[in-house]
């Protein structure tokens, strides 16, 4: 897996390392690998400054040069020194500023190729991450033929197109790939790797013997921190190289650590050439000169660093870091350095130095092996404890899950039984509802039939209702007319009754007067009998001359009766009463005047008058009855006329209605023939054709 792929994946929960170094590594151990890169000087720096004499004493190390190392997780690991020789140019500028970002130097005489030229960037580096900065593409070669960066770093190998192990693309920012996990379950204090612990740098005393120290008036402490900033970065713990099976020790890119192979269980990694160390040593004796343009710039620096993060312990880890020795420093002004600063070392010294460095590397490899074995034992112990804890947790989880499964099964069984009961109830309810629905459908059909029959009967009853309405209207008119006639008749009857009452009163009065007259007549008859007897006696005594016939009152009454026939009843009665009174007065007077002679005649006249009055009264009653009969006949004739008129009016109304119906029917037929639609009556509202019914007999109420 490529570093870019590892960086892009981010943190992983479970990513066990390769088993050829640590066996089975638990996920709780965080492994990190930090590789440092050399500090390159300004690309415009003259490479002849590498032969400036180094100072006599070294100042205190810059705190930024402390390099952290990652221990292998072994307590009380043996610390071992490592001497490494490296040459690098100081980041000297005209003002002694700090160098730029660090980058690795690849051992070729030409400039570093671009990022796309290295085919080894796809190499699998498991659980490895580089924390160095971006690459700088400006390199140049010094007089020894080595590639020197902007901060003085030179490569140790030449002519290789492969990128160094710490090479990283600029578009992939550094990320820390961790493997998660915790060691909570372990009761004992476990051995864990300590990442990024400070390391005490050590000076390379063997390199001081190669060239005599010279000072140019400026100690190292005053030269600025630019020369001390060379490729010291935080280191990481060693990690397996993934599926390739070979693990390598990561160096800062300038020392011989990248030249020597690291420990591998398969012993398949070959030894890299020792060109880095030889090139660094060969450059020591080469004369150099300073650039004339820079004032106060530092000379050629030799900073050697080694990644010793693989032999650190739990309490503290130590790493051997090469000292930074200045071969020369520039003066404060524009003055240059002497060209022949030091003499080249002898081959025996070089061989001795190489043997010492080789011995140091062997010691380092042995220490790394011991630390690896101890770390493997610790890791195995931790893994066993973790496995035991995991087994206990698994057993507890199984037990808990089995109990939960049983509970869930019981709940599911109870729920299933409840659901079955609900299903049975719902099925019964469904059957009952279906039966009720069928019954309701039957009832609905019956009701629809009844409604249809009722609508049909209603349609049949409509013309009858119309006829009945017309008859009711006719009867109402007749009743109103008869009521009016009744009112008139009642008024006439009341008038007649009043007249009858008046006549009855007059009759009573006449009867009373008649009784009186009869009584008077009886009394007069009695007196007449007595008078007649006395008269007969006296007639025999009187002479015949006195017995002349005189005018009787009867002769006077006859013309009066002829005149009275033309008068009314009341007038007649009044006249008769007056006549009777006058006659009575006359008779009384005659009786008084004539004495007994005219008494009989007066009585006769009175009797005749009363008989005439009775005959007149009878004739008046007969005339009144005839007038009543005539009035009744006239009223009946008028009634018949009114009834006939109502009949004709009703018949005319019926004929008018029939004509209107016929006209509407003709209009509908013509509209249907012309294409116009008329709204059809709905069911139950169809109007049947009205059949003209003849009013055979119309009865009216008789009064």
Curated annotation (Swiss-Prot):
GO CC list: cytoplasm; cytoskeleton; dendritic spine; glutamatergic synapse; postsynaptic density; synapse
Composition bias, Basic and acidic residues: 109-124, 683-703
Biased composition (Low complexity): 96-107, 251-268, 304-324
Chain residue ranges for the region called Disordered: 1-22, 40-190, 204-347, 665-703
Signal peptide limits: none
Tissue-level expression: Detected in brain, with highest expression in brain cortex, caudate putamen, cerebellum and hippocampus. Detected in neuropil (at protein level). Detected in brain and kidney.
Positions of modified residues (Phosphoserine): 346, 348
Role, per record: May be involved in promoting the maturation of dendritic spines, probably via regulating SIPA1L1 levels at the postsynaptic density of synapses.
Family in the record: Belongs to the LZTS3 family.
Protein name, UniProt field: Leucine zipper putative tumor suppressor 3
């Amino acid at each position: 897996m490529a570093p870019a792929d590892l960086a892009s994946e981010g943190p992983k929960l479970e990513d066990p390392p390769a088993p050829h170094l640590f066996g089975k590594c638990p996920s709780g151990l965080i492994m990190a690998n930090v590789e440092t890169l050399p500090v390159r000087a300004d690309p415009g720096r003259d490479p002849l400054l590498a032969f400036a004499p180094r100072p006599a004493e070294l100042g205190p190390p810059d705190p930024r040069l402390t390099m952290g190392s990652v221990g292998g997780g072994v307590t009380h690991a043996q610390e071992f020194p490592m001497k490494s020789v490296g040459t690098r140019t100081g980041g000297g500028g005209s003002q002694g500023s700090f160098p730029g970002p660090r980058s690795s130097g690849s051992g070729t005489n030409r400039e570093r190729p671009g990022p796309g030229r290295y085919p080894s960037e796809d190499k699998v580096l498991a659980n490895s991450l580089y924390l160095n900065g971006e690459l700088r593409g400006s390199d140049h070669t010094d007089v020894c033929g080595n590639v020197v960066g902007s901060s003085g770093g030179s490569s140790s190998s030449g002519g290789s197109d492969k990128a160094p192990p710490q090479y990283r693309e600029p578009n992939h920012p550094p990320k820390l790939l961790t493997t998660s996990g915790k060691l909570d379950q372990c009761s004992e204090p476990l051995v864990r790797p300590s990442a990024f612990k400070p390391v005490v740098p050590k000076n390379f005393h063997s390199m001081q013997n190669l060239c005599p120290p010279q000072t140019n008036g400026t100690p190292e402490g005053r030269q600025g921190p630019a020369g001390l900033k060379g490729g010291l970065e935080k280191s990481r713990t060693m990690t397996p190289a993934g599926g390739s099976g070979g693990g390598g020790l990561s160096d800062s890119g300038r020392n011989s650590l990248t030249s020597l192979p690291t420990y591998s269980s398969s012993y398949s990694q070959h030894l890299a050439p020792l060109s880095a160390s030889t090139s660094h040593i060969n450059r020591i004796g080469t004369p150099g000169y300073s650039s004339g343009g820079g004032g106060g710039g530092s000379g050629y620096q030799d900073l050697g660093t080694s990644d010793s993060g693989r032999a650190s312990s739990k309490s503290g880890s130590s790493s051997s870091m090469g000292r930074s020795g200045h071969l020369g420093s520039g003066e404060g002004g524009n003055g240059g350095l002497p060209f022949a600063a030091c003499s080249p070392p002898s081959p025996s010294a070089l061989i001795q130095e190489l043997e010492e460095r080789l011995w140091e590397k062997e010691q380092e490899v042995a220490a790394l092996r011991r630390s690896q074995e101890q770390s493997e034992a610790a890791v195995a112990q931790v893994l066993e404890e973790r496995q035991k804890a995991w087994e206990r947790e698994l057993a507890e989880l199984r037990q808990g899950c089995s109990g939960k499964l049983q509970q869930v099964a019981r709940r599911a069984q109870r729920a299933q039984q409840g659901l079955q009961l609900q299903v049975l109830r719902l099925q019964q309810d469904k059957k009952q509802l279906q039966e009720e629905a069928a019954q309701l459908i039957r009832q609905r059909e019956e009701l629809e039939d009844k409604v249809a029959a009722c609508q049909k009967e209603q349609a049949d009853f409509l013309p009858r209702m119309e006829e009945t309405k017309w008859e009711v209207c006719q009867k109402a008119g007749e009743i109103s007319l008869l009521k009016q006639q009744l009112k008139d008749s009642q008024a006439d009857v009341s008038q007649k009754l009043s007249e009858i009452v008046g006549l009855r009163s007059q009759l009573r009065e006449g009867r009373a007067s008649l009784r009186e007259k009869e009584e008077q007549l009886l009394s007069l008859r009695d007196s007449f009998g007595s008078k007649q007897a006395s008269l007969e006696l006296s007639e025999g005594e009187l002479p015949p001359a006195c017995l002349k016939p005189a005018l009787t009152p009867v002769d006077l009454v006859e013309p009066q009766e002829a005149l009275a026939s033309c008068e009314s009843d009341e007038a007649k009665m009044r006249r008769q009463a007056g006549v009777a009174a006058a006659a009575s007065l006359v008779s009384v007077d005659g009786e008084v005047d004539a004495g007994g002679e005219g008494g009989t005649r007066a009585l006769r006249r009175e009797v005749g008058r009363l008989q005439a009055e009775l005959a007149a009264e009878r004739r008046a009653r007969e005339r009144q009855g005839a007038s009543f009969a005539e009035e009744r006949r006239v009223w009946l004739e008028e009634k018949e006329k009114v009834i006939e008129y109502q009949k004709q009016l009703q018949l005319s109304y019926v004929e008018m209605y029939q004509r209107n119906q016929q006209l509407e029917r003709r209009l509908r037929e013509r509209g249907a023939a012309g294409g116009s639609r008329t709204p059809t009556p709905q069911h139950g509202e169809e109007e049947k054709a009205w059949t003209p019914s003849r009013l055979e007999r119309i009865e009216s109420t008789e009064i």
